[in-house]
Amino acid sequence: MRTRAAVALAPGKPLQVMDVNLEDPREGEVLIEIKATGICHTDEFTLSGADPEGLFPAILGHEGAGVVVKCGPGVKSLKPGDHVIPLYTPECRECPSCLSQKTNLCTAIRATQGQGLMPDGTTRFSMLDGTPIFHYMGCSTFANHTVMPEIALAKVRDDAPFDKICYIGCGVTTGIGAVLNTAKVEIGAKAVVFGLGGIGLNVIQGLKMAGADMIIGVDINDDKKEWGEKFGMTHFVNPKSLPEGTSVVQAIVDMTKTPFDKIGGADYSFDCTGNVKVMRDALECTHRGWGQSIIIGVAPAGATIETRPFQLVTGRVWKGTAFGGARGRTDVPKIVDWYMDGKIEIDSMITHILPLDRINEGFDLMHEGKSIRSVVVF
């Protein structure tokens, strides 16, 4: 069949909207009509050419929602008409990682997914002249139709709006999940969030759900203060506005001191920036003896993090998280329910709705800092 897609032909170049060929689903695969897709910083990272694993030509996009059109042989959990959210972190429920219950990082299709291919080592997309087009993160939601493995699709309720729940495919789950699944924040905790973009706001939302008492947002853009407060932030710090000689670490330690606890420091911190210097600050502002710092942001290729070993010897912990520690097929439907039940907010984060032909405007809005999340609808 033919479908419409925004194709990344080369790094650093705008996406080109065109008709492409799409083959039918094979064994264990599903054809999806994508109804809406978010534009994420990860898509931008690859499109820019900074991603060492970036492949071209490719159909990017990994934050979508749509409807099952056709199932290949052997598919048991889905049928035509089902509403689904694509998962860049699948859940096969059979590999050692899934069975361990210690991680959400399913390894069933990781090797081929990283090569921009389907599990059988081939691609379903091609140019009209037959040139193969790579898949992206196993999803390729910048196409009106895509083919994905059954294990990488979460079935969700039919009454949830596609242009909102697509955000659950990455940003919402990554932020909220980092709080609830990875850090396991408890009622009354003091927490700090570095970087108040889409992920950071969802971390704040997760902290509010968890019952954190003190939620400190850190950003160099004062405009983010209003956004943070909307989702539950209680305090705001702009490192550029601190008195001369006062570091952001010292400011946070001082803010979290009490008459009972004169040491100070956050119980939890979350880095949503991908900046390795900020990651160090995020660790070192946590409390001696038990502070946990969760790394969410993706750093540039080759970047390394550092701190004095004494910071770790004295009880602080560095943790990483991917997709918020969520097991996609199990957890994503629950998060959709939370949204539909009014337990989490998504609507106000979708700041721009665009047709596919204007997808490059969504990237421009991201670069200019004018959007939280732009969504393309088909």
Each language-model region and where it sits:
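C-terminal hydrophobic helical "lid"/dimerization subdomain
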Residues: M1, P259, R280-E284, G325, ...
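Glycine-rich beta-strand-centered segment in the early N-terminal region that forms part
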Residues: E23-T37, A50-L99, N104, T112, ...
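NAD(P)H dinucleotide-binding glycine-rich loop of Rossmann-like/cofactor-binding domains
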Residues: E94-F194, L242
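Adenosine-nucleotide cofactor-binding segment
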Residues: V193-L196, K208-D281, G302
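N-terminal Rossmann-fold NAD(P) dinucleotide-binding loop
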Residues: G200-L201
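Helix-to-beta-strand junctions that scaffold the AdoMet/dcAdoMet cofactor pocket
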Residues: T286-R288
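Glycine-centered, small-residue-biased loops immediately flanking beta-strands
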Residues: W290-Q292, R316
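Rossmann-fold NAD(P)-binding glycine/threonine-rich loop
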Residues: G297-G315, P333
